[in-house]
């Protein structure tokens, strides 16, 4: 395909996100992703918990101990520096600008549960569960330029109606770690496997089978002419200037395009904004914004020589 396309001058990607539905949002980076399945086995078969607990360690507790190697249980900060990267100053500045636009909507957009209890004297202040940071700039940087670990699935756990007084022989967890845009995913995946499998507690059988290793993407510097054009089109379309922000998701194709076409100008944008809930059960698009953004992108194509 590269030989058929030839030299690419401009690359438009339209499956990214937006901070709100009031202006053009230009994606400056995408996080990478490494992940896989962690299996912890301590017995050949399940046994009576009354007979075995206290002698046989819980496979779930061993899994917890292994996960503690990866991130801090209180803050969620990923511990190993191999998963971190320095944040370019211009991206910090853009995060500050985006934070000033979005304010606390950067974290209030998510469907938090209401508080079940609150410290004495703070009942009115505690209306919902809270994020890792309420500072908009830190929240943006946390989800765009810092690694984060999630457990996205589990196996070898019976359903509640089938669970009995049995000490289970194993625990299996599906792990997903988002990594900064400039971290090498293959290197991070190898390190993740080594961190989980070495020195297994109680000499348990521990195996991590990697299934994802996709590096992120960091946008090249945008030419002044293209930046001015995008700002003008945003003002014409939305009556507000263009804004810049990284995204926390992963589009492996972008990293590949960046490698194959290093001289190309990139405009990555999209309609996945507040409450759009990408990949969720009620994913939706703001139709009015999608139509407006389509007109704006048509303007970019019409002025392809800028």
Predicted regions and their residues:
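Fold-level recognition of mixed alpha/beta catalytic cores in primary-metabolism enzymes, strongest
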Residues: 1-130, 141-147, 260, 282-290
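Short amphipathic alpha-helices in soluble, non-transmembrane regions
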Residues: 188-197
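A short beta-alpha structural unit
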Residues: 177-180, 207-223
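A structural supersecondary motif
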Residues: 133, 138-169, 176
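Zn-dependent metallopeptidase/amidohydrolase metal-coordination segment
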Residues: 39-41, 46-48, 63, 145, ...
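Short glycine/threonine-rich loop-to-helix capping motif typified by GTGT followed
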Residues: 90-98, 217-226, 255-260
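A glycine-rich phosphate-binding loop feature that marks nucleotide/adenosyl-phosphate handling sites
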Residues: 79-94, 131-134, 157, 211-213, ...
